[in-house]
Curated annotation (Swiss-Prot):
One of its GO terms (molecular function) is RNA nuclease activity. PROSITE patterns: BARWIN_1, BARWIN_2, BARWIN_3. This is Wound-induced protein. SUPFAM superfamilies: Barwin-like endoglucanases. InterPro entries: Barwin_CS (IPR018226), Barwin_dom (IPR001153), PR4 (IPR044301), RlpA-like_sf (IPR036908). It comes from Glycine max. Keywords: Disulfide bond.
Length: 102
């Protein structure tokens, strides 16, 4: 993919309980919201993981860890929702996951 595609959003690995898995999720976008502060951002799925949630790149983690508690606790609790980023998938029900600190 071109740099403009790769740099539009922060990156995450995805292995959540709902939604496409593996290769089918790659390139899709999520709106990720810190449940403690309401801070949110859009990320693009670029990999898969095995922890049952999301594995955010450090820039994204820091962007939504606005009160520093995620870093202190070693994880964030977030809601995530599939959003349109130029792909056809648009799931509207928010989901819940726990993220480990970078």
């Amino acid at each position: 993919k071109p740099y403009s595609w790769r740099s539009k959003y922060g990156w995450t690995a995805f292995c959540g309980p709902v939604g496409p898995r593996g290769r089918d999720s790659c390139g899709k976008c999520l709106r990720v919201t810190n449940t403690g502060t309401g801070a949110n951002t859009i990320v693009r799925i670029v990999d898969q993981c095995s922890n049952g949630g999301l594995d955010l790149d450090v820039g994204v983690f820091n962007r939504i860890d606005t009160d520093g508690r995620g870093y202190q606790q070693g994880h964030l609790i977030v809601n995530y929702q599939f959003v349109d980023c130029g792909n056809e998938l648009d799931l509207t029900k928010p989901l819940l996951s726990i993220l480990d600190a970078p």
